[in-house]
Swiss-Prot record:
Record PTM: Specific enzymatic cleavages in vivo yield mature proteins. Envelope glycoproteins are synthesized as an inactive precursor that is N-glycosylated and processed likely by host cell furin or by a furin-like protease in the Golgi to yield the mature SU and TM proteins. The cleavage site between SU and TM requires the minimal sequence [KR]-X-[KR]-R.
Lineage: Viruses, Riboviria, Pararnavirae, Artverviricota, Revtraviricetes
Known partners and oligomeric status: The mature envelope protein (Env) consists of a trimer of SU-TM heterodimers attached by noncovalent interactions or by a labile interchain disulfide bond.
Superkingdom, taxonomy of origin: Viruses
Protein name according to UniProt: Envelope glycoprotein
Organism (species): Mouse intracisternal a-particle MIAE
GO cellular component entries: host cell plasma membrane; membrane; viral envelope; virion membrane
Region annotated Fusion peptide, chain positions: 364-384
UniProt entry keywords in alphabetical sequence: Cleavage on pair of basic residues, Coiled coil, Disulfide bond, Fusion of virus membrane with host cell membrane, Fusion of virus membrane with host membrane, Glycoprotein, Host cell membrane, Host membrane, Host-virus interaction, Membrane, Signal, Transmembrane, Transmembrane helix, Viral attachment to host cell, Viral envelope protein, Viral penetration into host cytoplasm, Virion, Virus entry into host cell
Annotated site (Cleavage): 362-363
Ranges in the topological domain labelled Cytoplasmic: 549-584
Residue positions the entry lists as glycosylated: 58, 77, 98, 129, 140, 147, 230, 276, 285, 311, 319, 463, 469, 481, 501
Listed GO biological process terms: fusion of virus membrane with host plasma membrane; symbiont entry into host cell; virion attachment to host cell
Residues passing through the membrane, by range: 528-548
Length: 584
């Protein structure tokens, strides 16, 4: 039974191969295949096209939220490069983005003076200390550490408007705005971040010590935008309470110190100037809104992104030192690297196919025939002009020669333009046909062959689009032999025009019956040759048409015989009689 099945399958394979030999097909071409890979997280680099979106696990923070996901061992030994990768660390050495707990505030317009003290012991300098109170929306959470040495002005892709919002009485007044004050977050300068809470450390509004270390005018509740070098950005606001923290609205007490130098002329400050101005927030004055405390809140990412977690360097990762999870809990792991799992990978494979994806492109035969016909007609007109030279009187011949020269000159210019126009038209037709073919192919995209972990599509690997090849072929065609012959024909035509234009007949030689008979015979001989050439061309076309019809009839007959043979195999009968018809 098994032998019979093998024999039947062998005959079926032979008939299938015979059938393939009768019709055009694509054999052994490379196709795009979709390979299902084993999940292996790859670090997200600074030049990645897409950055992940971060989520918090606390709904009350008013930020994007996801449920907490447990951790699992990494399952292998790997060495992950930290520099240039999107990774974070909590107050430790390494090349990841450093995060630290710090207090930041959005200082409102409500402000008042408490007291002022002055030191006038020096005649030229007066030191003034002003104690003030300031209303502020403050947050004690996780942020980038301050950097007093970075004064570089950067630019980020604008994913949100720049704006300043009114105080609406919220405890966490998150805005949908993006700050224009930007800084680098790593020493290799691969990631930029906004808002930079210290724009210029030397400005008088910067608080370098006290409860808040920041620029007095900055707004920490804007979008925390982290961007890579290729314009990919993400928001880090969900990391605010990853170590826990608190938030509230209160009034703080601060001290503003500055010195007045008397006797120094300044156009903007009359007879004195200010230097060494500093602002420092020293402590609470009174609480306006109750403080809200938050525990350590893990941050999560959505698949296909995940975290690779560790408490040591990522350069040496093992199954015991690194873990993977959708969420990062700093109470368990102080370092996290964002990774992405490429679940499906496109790969080129070589496989036989019975699909005829696209019909063959039309060549430029029609264009060449039209151009050659134009050249032939121009040459025939030139020959007719030569023949008519002796058939008319000498007086009219000079005028005819000049008119013929002008006409052929115009036709030469028109033929050159027509050549370029027809080439452009052919290219447009080929490009339109290619686009229709690609749309048809994409509309019917599926698995031509589906294996356990591999889907072989019908999309050709090298010839997915023929547009570039068509343009290249067009350029080669224009520079080929046909184009050279066409240019030679035009040059010969121009030479003939010049020769006709330089022809001047003597009136004494234009009379006589013998000369007229000779010219008439020459004229008749030229047109007889043109007629015979046309008859021969028509006969050749008829013979070619007959051969094509005969070939199509033979192919139709062979397909019917093969179909009958396949039907005989399915019914258990012998297909030998049908195969013998193919041999005959």
């Amino acid at each position: 039974m098994v032998q019979k099945m093998l024999t039947s399958r062998g005959l079926f394979l032979i008939l299938t191969m015979l059938n393939l030999s009768q019709v055009p097909s694509i054999m052994g071409e490379q196709r795009w295949a979709i390979l299902s890979t084993f999940p292996k997280p790859m670090p997200v680099r600074h030049d990645a096209i897409v950055f992940p979106k971060f989520f918090t696990t606390n709904k009350t923070v008013d930020l994007p939220y996801l449920l907490y996901d447990p951790t699992a061992p990494l399952g292998e030994n790997r060495s992950l490069l930290e520099q240039g990768s999107l990774c974070f660390q909590i107050n430790g050495p390494g090349n990841c983005i450093n995060l630290t707990a710090r207090a930041l505030g959005k200082f409102n317009e409500h402000r008042g003076w408490v007291s002022t003290t002055q030191d006038t012991s020096n005649v030229e300098i007066t030191f003034t200390n002003r104690t003030f109170w300031q209303e502020v929306n403050w947050v004690n959470g996780t942020f980038l550490p301050p950097n007093f040495s970075d004064k570089e002005h950067l630019h980020q892709p604008k994913i949100a408007p720049h704006c300043s919002l009114e105080d609406e009485g919220l405890i966490l007044p998150w805005s949908d705005c993006q700050s224009s004050i930007i800084r680098w977050v790593d020493q290799s300068k691969t990631f930029s971040f906004s808002p930079n809470m210290i724009d210029d450390p030397e400005k008088e509004f910067v608080m370098k010590k006290g409860l808040f270390i920041q620029d007095f005018r900055m707004h920490p509740f804007h979008k925390w935008v982290l961007c890579g070098v290729n314009g990919s950005c993400t928001e880090l606001n969900p990391l605010i309470f990853i170590q826990g923290g608190a938030v509230g609205k209160a009034s703080f007490t601060g001290i503003s110190r500055f010195a007045q130098y008397w006797g120094i002329h300044d156009a903007s400050q009359d007879s004195y100037g200010y230097t060494n101005t500093s602002v420092e927030i020293t402590g609470f004055n009174k609480t306006l809104v109750n403080q809200i405390n938050y525990p350590s809140t893990p941050v999560c990412v959505y698949p296909p992104f995940l975290f690779i977690l560790s408490n040591d360097s990522f350069e040496v990762c093992s199954n015991d030192s690194c873990w993977i999870s959708q969420c990062w809990d700093v109470t368990k792991n102080t370092r996290a690297m964002v990774a992405r799992i490429p679940r499906w990978i496109p790969v080129p494979v070589e496989t036989p196919s019975t699909l005829s994806m696209f019909r063959q492109k039309r060549d430029f035969g029609i264009t060449a025939a039209m151009i050659i016909a134009i050249s032939a007609s121009a040459a025939a007109a030139t020959a007719a002009g030569y023949a008519m030279v002796s058939a008319v009187s000498g007086t009219k011949l000079n005028q005819l020669s000049a008119d013929l020269a002008d006409a052929i000159t115009v036709q030469t210019s028109a033929s050159t333009k027509l050549k370029g126009g027809l080439m452009i038209l052919n290219q447009c037709l080929d490009l339109a046909e290619e686009q229709i073919g690609v749309l048809h192919q994409m509309a019917q995209l599926g698995c031509e062959r589906k294996l356990e972990a591999l889907c072989i599509t019908s999309v050709q690997y090298e010839n997915f689009t023929y547009a570039a090849n068509l343009s290249r072929q067009l350029s080669l065609y224009l520079a080929g032999n046909w184009s050279e012959r066409f240019d030679e024909t035009l040059e010969a035509l121009i030479a003939a025009v010049l020769k006709i234009n330089s022809t001047r007949m003597d009136l004494s030689l234009t009379e006589g019956l013998s000369s007229w008979i000779s010219s008439a015979f020459s004229y008749f001989k030229e047109w007889v040759g043109v007629g015979l050439f046309g008859v021969a061309t028509c006969c050749g076309l008829v013979v070619m048409l007959w051969l094509v019809c005969k070939l199509r009839t033979q192919q139709t007959r062979d397909k019917v015989v093969i179909t009958q043979a396949l039907a005989a195999i399915e019914q258990g009968a012998s297909p030998e009689i049908w195969l013998s018809m193919l041999k005959n």
